[in-house]
Amino acid sequence: MTRSVDIKNREREILGLIIDSYIEESKPISSAYICQKYHLACSTATIRNIMVLLEKQGFLSHLYTSSGRVPTQEGFRCYVENCDRQNDSQEYSISLDSYASSQPSIEDVISHTLDALVQLSGYTSLMAVSGRDEKIFFRGMRFMLEQPEFEDVRRLKDIFYTLEVKMGALQNLFFDSIDDGIRILIGDDIGFEEIADCSLVISGLRDKDLSFAFALLGPMRMNYNKATSSLQSVRNRLKETVEEFI
Protein backbone atom coordinates (compact mmCIF):
# COMPACT_ATOMS: atom_id res chain seq x y z
CA MET A 1 0.00 0.00 0.00
CA THR A 2 1.48 3.33 -1.06
CA ARG A 3 1.73 6.21 1.37
CA SER A 4 2.02 8.74 -1.42
CA VAL A 5 -1.53 10.03 -0.87
CA ASP A 6 -0.24 11.82 2.24
CA ILE A 7 2.23 13.99 0.35
CA LYS A 8 1.53 17.74 0.35
CA ASN A 9 1.14 19.76 -2.83
CA ARG A 10 4.48 21.59 -2.54
CA GLU A 11 6.32 18.39 -1.73
CA ARG A 12 4.55 16.67 -4.63
CA GLU A 13 5.65 19.40 -7.00
CA ILE A 14 9.29 19.22 -5.92
CA LEU A 15 9.28 15.42 -6.05
CA GLY A 16 7.98 15.61 -9.61
CA LEU A 17 10.74 18.01 -10.63
CA ILE A 18 13.38 15.83 -8.98
CA ILE A 19 12.18 12.71 -10.76
CA ASP A 20 11.82 14.52 -14.10
CA SER A 21 15.45 15.59 -13.71
CA TYR A 22 16.58 12.14 -12.60
CA ILE A 23 14.90 10.51 -15.60
CA GLU A 24 16.78 12.91 -17.85
CA GLU A 25 20.15 12.99 -16.12
CA SER A 26 20.48 9.53 -14.51
CA LYS A 27 22.41 10.94 -11.56
CA PRO A 28 21.65 12.20 -8.03
CA ILE A 29 19.77 15.50 -8.09
CA SER A 30 20.71 18.37 -5.77
CA SER A 31 18.62 21.28 -4.50
CA ALA A 32 20.86 23.72 -6.38
CA TYR A 33 20.25 21.84 -9.63
CA ILE A 34 16.47 22.02 -9.16
CA CYS A 35 16.54 25.76 -8.41
CA GLN A 36 18.72 26.54 -11.40
CA LYS A 37 16.98 24.27 -13.90
CA TYR A 38 13.41 25.30 -13.11
CA HIS A 39 14.07 28.92 -12.00
CA LEU A 40 12.08 28.45 -8.82
CA ALA A 41 11.16 31.48 -6.74
CA CYS A 42 12.65 30.04 -3.57
CA SER A 43 16.07 29.38 -2.10
CA THR A 44 18.12 26.23 -2.36
CA ALA A 45 17.74 25.93 1.41
CA THR A 46 13.96 25.72 1.03
CA ILE A 47 14.28 23.01 -1.62
CA ARG A 48 16.83 21.19 0.52
CA ASN A 49 14.42 21.17 3.47
CA ILE A 50 11.67 19.74 1.29
CA MET A 51 14.06 17.08 0.02
CA VAL A 52 14.85 16.13 3.62
CA LEU A 53 11.12 15.73 4.29
CA LEU A 54 10.70 13.63 1.16
CA GLU A 55 13.59 11.44 2.28
CA LYS A 56 12.01 10.95 5.71
CA GLN A 57 8.76 9.96 4.00
CA GLY A 58 10.60 7.35 1.96
CA PHE A 59 10.29 9.01 -1.43
CA LEU A 60 13.98 9.90 -1.85
CA SER A 61 17.25 8.28 -0.91
CA HIS A 62 20.47 10.09 -0.02
CA LEU A 63 23.67 8.74 -1.52
CA TYR A 64 26.48 9.65 0.85
CA THR A 65 28.95 9.84 -2.03
CA SER A 66 26.90 12.70 -3.47
CA SER A 67 25.10 15.80 -2.23
CA GLY A 68 22.11 14.89 -4.37
CA ARG A 69 19.26 12.46 -3.91
CA VAL A 70 17.64 9.77 -6.02
CA PRO A 71 14.03 8.53 -6.05
CA THR A 72 13.07 5.32 -4.27
CA GLN A 73 10.46 2.84 -5.50
CA GLU A 74 7.95 4.64 -3.31
CA GLY A 75 8.98 7.92 -4.90
CA PHE A 76 8.39 6.59 -8.39
CA ARG A 77 5.01 5.19 -7.33
CA CYS A 78 4.00 8.60 -6.03
CA TYR A 79 5.24 10.20 -9.24
CA VAL A 80 3.10 7.88 -11.33
CA GLU A 81 0.01 7.67 -9.13
CA ASN A 82 -0.40 11.05 -7.48
CA CYS A 83 1.96 13.68 -8.84
CA ASP A 84 0.53 16.15 -11.32
CA ARG A 85 2.34 14.95 -14.40
CA GLN A 86 2.18 16.90 -17.62
CA ASN A 87 -0.43 15.13 -19.72
CA ASP A 88 1.09 14.10 -23.01
CA SER A 89 -2.11 13.70 -25.01
CA GLN A 90 -0.46 13.83 -28.40
CA GLU A 91 -0.75 10.55 -30.23
CA TYR A 92 2.40 9.43 -31.94
CA SER A 93 2.11 8.88 -35.66
CA ILE A 94 2.32 5.19 -36.40
CA SER A 95 2.84 3.67 -39.80
CA LEU A 96 1.40 0.18 -39.93
CA ASP A 97 0.25 0.49 -43.51
CA SER A 98 1.59 -2.97 -44.33
CA TYR A 99 -1.55 -4.29 -42.65
CA ALA A 100 -3.68 -2.63 -45.30
CA SER A 101 -2.12 -4.34 -48.30
CA SER A 102 -3.49 -7.77 -47.44
CA GLN A 103 -5.07 -9.57 -44.54
CA PRO A 104 -2.28 -9.84 -41.96
CA SER A 105 -1.46 -13.00 -40.08
CA ILE A 106 -1.15 -13.03 -36.31
CA GLU A 107 2.61 -13.21 -36.83
CA ASP A 108 2.44 -10.00 -38.89
CA VAL A 109 0.46 -8.30 -36.14
CA ILE A 110 3.01 -9.35 -33.52
CA SER A 111 6.00 -8.26 -35.58
CA HIS A 112 4.64 -4.86 -36.59
CA THR A 113 3.29 -4.11 -33.12
CA LEU A 114 6.66 -4.80 -31.54
CA ASP A 115 8.42 -2.72 -34.18
CA ALA A 116 6.07 0.20 -33.59
CA LEU A 117 6.49 0.06 -29.82
CA VAL A 118 10.28 -0.01 -30.07
CA GLN A 119 10.30 2.85 -32.58
CA LEU A 120 8.00 5.08 -30.54
CA SER A 121 9.21 4.41 -27.02
CA GLY A 122 12.88 3.49 -27.24
CA TYR A 123 12.33 0.72 -24.68
CA THR A 124 12.34 -3.06 -24.84
CA SER A 125 8.94 -4.19 -26.12
CA LEU A 126 7.15 -7.38 -25.11
CA MET A 127 4.01 -9.03 -26.45
CA ALA A 128 1.83 -12.05 -25.75
CA VAL A 129 -1.09 -13.38 -27.77
CA SER A 130 -3.64 -15.87 -26.52
CA GLY A 131 -3.33 -19.30 -28.10
CA ARG A 132 0.41 -18.93 -28.64
CA ASP A 133 1.32 -21.37 -25.87
CA GLU A 134 3.20 -19.55 -23.11
CA LYS A 135 5.45 -17.57 -25.38
CA ILE A 136 6.53 -13.96 -24.85
CA PHE A 137 7.72 -12.17 -27.98
CA PHE A 138 10.16 -9.34 -27.48
CA ARG A 139 12.15 -6.81 -29.42
CA GLY A 140 14.65 -4.05 -28.67
CA MET A 141 16.81 -5.61 -25.96
CA ARG A 142 19.61 -3.39 -27.27
CA PHE A 143 17.95 -0.45 -25.54
CA MET A 144 18.70 -2.05 -22.19
CA LEU A 145 22.40 -1.79 -23.02
CA GLU A 146 22.03 1.98 -23.39
CA GLN A 147 20.77 2.39 -19.82
CA PRO A 148 23.40 2.87 -17.08
CA GLU A 149 21.31 0.71 -14.74
CA PHE A 150 22.15 -2.32 -16.88
CA GLU A 151 25.86 -1.85 -17.45
CA ASP A 152 26.39 -4.93 -15.30
CA VAL A 153 25.92 -7.88 -17.67
CA ARG A 154 24.51 -9.93 -14.80
CA ARG A 155 21.46 -7.69 -14.79
CA LEU A 156 20.79 -8.51 -18.43
CA LYS A 157 21.15 -12.20 -17.65
CA ASP A 158 18.44 -11.83 -15.01
CA ILE A 159 16.14 -10.21 -17.54
CA PHE A 160 16.73 -12.91 -20.15
CA TYR A 161 16.16 -15.54 -17.48
CA THR A 162 12.76 -14.06 -16.67
CA LEU A 163 11.75 -13.82 -20.33
CA GLU A 164 12.83 -17.37 -21.12
CA VAL A 165 12.12 -19.36 -17.96
CA LYS A 166 9.10 -17.56 -16.52
CA MET A 167 7.15 -16.97 -19.71
CA GLY A 168 3.97 -18.60 -18.44
CA ALA A 169 3.78 -16.50 -15.29
CA LEU A 170 4.71 -13.35 -17.20
CA GLN A 171 2.03 -14.05 -19.81
CA ASN A 172 -0.58 -14.48 -17.07
CA LEU A 173 0.44 -11.11 -15.64
CA PHE A 174 0.04 -9.54 -19.07
CA PHE A 175 -3.42 -10.96 -19.73
CA ASP A 176 -4.62 -10.13 -16.21
CA SER A 177 -3.66 -6.50 -16.88
CA ILE A 178 -5.46 -5.98 -20.20
CA ASP A 179 -8.69 -4.72 -18.69
CA ASP A 180 -6.84 -2.08 -16.65
CA GLY A 181 -6.30 0.12 -19.72
CA ILE A 182 -2.66 0.91 -19.02
CA ARG A 183 -1.09 -0.65 -15.95
CA ILE A 184 2.22 0.53 -14.52
CA LEU A 185 4.17 -1.84 -12.29
CA ILE A 186 7.23 -0.49 -10.51
CA GLY A 187 9.96 -2.57 -8.90
CA ASP A 188 8.61 -5.17 -6.49
CA ASP A 189 5.09 -4.63 -7.86
CA ILE A 190 6.06 -6.66 -10.93
CA GLY A 191 6.35 -9.78 -8.79
CA PHE A 192 9.55 -11.19 -10.29
CA GLU A 193 12.70 -10.95 -8.21
CA GLU A 194 14.98 -10.95 -11.25
CA ILE A 195 13.49 -7.72 -12.63
CA ALA A 196 12.58 -6.05 -9.34
CA ASP A 197 14.68 -3.01 -10.22
CA CYS A 198 12.75 -2.43 -13.45
CA SER A 199 9.38 -0.98 -14.41
CA LEU A 200 6.81 -2.63 -16.63
CA VAL A 201 4.06 -0.70 -18.42
CA ILE A 202 1.34 -2.98 -19.80
CA SER A 203 -1.63 -2.55 -22.12
CA GLY A 204 -3.57 -4.67 -24.57
CA LEU A 205 -6.96 -5.47 -26.01
CA ARG A 206 -9.43 -8.30 -26.38
CA ASP A 207 -11.31 -9.08 -29.58
CA LYS A 208 -13.64 -12.06 -29.88
CA ASP A 209 -11.54 -15.08 -29.01
CA LEU A 210 -8.19 -13.30 -29.16
CA SER A 211 -6.31 -11.38 -26.49
CA PHE A 212 -3.32 -9.19 -27.28
CA ALA A 213 -1.12 -7.95 -24.45
CA PHE A 214 1.94 -5.78 -24.95
CA ALA A 215 4.31 -4.02 -22.60
CA LEU A 216 7.39 -1.87 -22.27
CA LEU A 217 10.22 -2.94 -19.98
CA GLY A 218 12.81 -0.50 -18.73
CA PRO A 219 14.54 0.89 -15.68
CA MET A 220 12.46 2.51 -12.94
CA ARG A 221 13.95 5.71 -14.34
CA MET A 222 11.88 5.36 -17.49
CA ASN A 223 9.94 8.15 -19.17
CA TYR A 224 6.44 7.15 -18.10
CA ASN A 225 4.69 9.85 -20.15
CA LYS A 226 6.38 8.63 -23.31
CA ALA A 227 5.81 4.97 -22.43
CA THR A 228 2.08 5.35 -21.78
CA SER A 229 1.54 7.55 -24.86
CA SER A 230 3.37 5.00 -27.03
CA LEU A 231 1.28 2.13 -25.70
CA GLN A 232 -1.97 4.05 -26.16
CA SER A 233 -1.10 4.97 -29.74
CA VAL A 234 -0.18 1.41 -30.63
CA ARG A 235 -3.28 0.05 -28.89
CA ASN A 236 -5.55 2.38 -30.87
CA ARG A 237 -3.91 1.47 -34.18
CA LEU A 238 -3.94 -2.24 -33.37
CA LYS A 239 -7.63 -2.05 -32.44
CA GLU A 240 -8.41 -0.66 -35.89
CA THR A 241 -6.38 -3.42 -37.51
CA VAL A 242 -8.00 -6.19 -35.49
CA GLU A 243 -11.52 -4.92 -36.20
CA GLU A 244 -10.82 -4.67 -39.92
CA PHE A 245 -8.82 -7.80 -40.64
CA ILE A 246 -8.66 -10.32 -37.79
Predicted segments, located by residue:
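Alpha-helical promoter-recognition and RNA polymerase-docking modules of transcription initiation factors
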Residues: 2-5, 38-40, 232, 244
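Short alpha-helical segments that sit at the start of domains
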Residues: 1-16
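N-terminal helix-turn-helix
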Residues: 17-20, 24, 28-82
